[in-house]
Amino acid sequence: QPTVSIGLSKLREHFNDPLFVRIGNNMQPTDLSNNIYNDVHDILIRLQSINDFNLAFDPKTSNHQFNISMTDISHLVLLPKLINYLREHSPHIRLNIVPIDTHTQASMASGDIDLAIGFLPQLEAGFYQQTLFQQHYVVVANANHPRLSQKSLTHEQYASELHIDILATGGHYVVEHELQKLGVKRNILVRLPSYLGVGLVVQETDAIATIPNYLSKVLLSRGDLKILDLPYAFPEYGVKQHWHSRVHQNPSNQWLRRLCFELFSNL
């Protein structure tokens, strides 16, 4: 009641009209109230429609398309699990996966990207974020590598073996930074623009690669590889999902974030 009274007082002041007057025991609208009633009623209906639209997301029946920006590691490690869940539980929802690049921040701010997933230090400031899981680095090598028969590498082995360097955003800089701090220089055989081809190159050569642990498990299941422990203590890092404030309260985006957390937080 107080809120209504305050609102009515503001409207009376704005229109310079009482809007309602007492006639006998009843309150009756003034001529101005009658004149603006239809317009106000239409506006209220539209506002209610907008509110209902915001609450109407049903993942079981929705044909919504989500635009998700992912690192290439997320393509290999996370995306199949998300796709399989949607096929079973939300068969009409579609995904549009786009790469992480210099336009990602602007695309999230404009609403063109709903969610970004991966190790993305460039999105630490100015965006909402949630850690999905912690990640650490390991070395992968050919399962029949002629010189590496143990479960871990020595400092000397790591320095002397040929390496595959991956120039992907985020993780590449972690590896380089840690090795520089330790004064370790790798003998680089080849540099790859992404992680997508690293498994095949390792499998077919005697070069080794330093990659995130979860990726190594995926590659191990698909190729003739083995996983070795690093001789150095690299820090763990968080794989996160990031989103812009414009979609923070959006029901479909909230559902997607909850789903990603449920699917990936216990990897």
Please tell me what each predicted stretch does.
Residues 126-163:
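Flexible hinge/capping segments at coil-to-helix
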Residues 63-123, 192:
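Central regulatory/effector-binding core of bacterial HTH transcription factors
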Residues 147-149, 161-182, 249-253, 257, ...:
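Secondary-structure junction motif
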Residues 12-29:
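A short LG(V/I)-centered, amphipathic sequence patch enriched
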Residues 78, 226-267:
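A late-sequence structural motif
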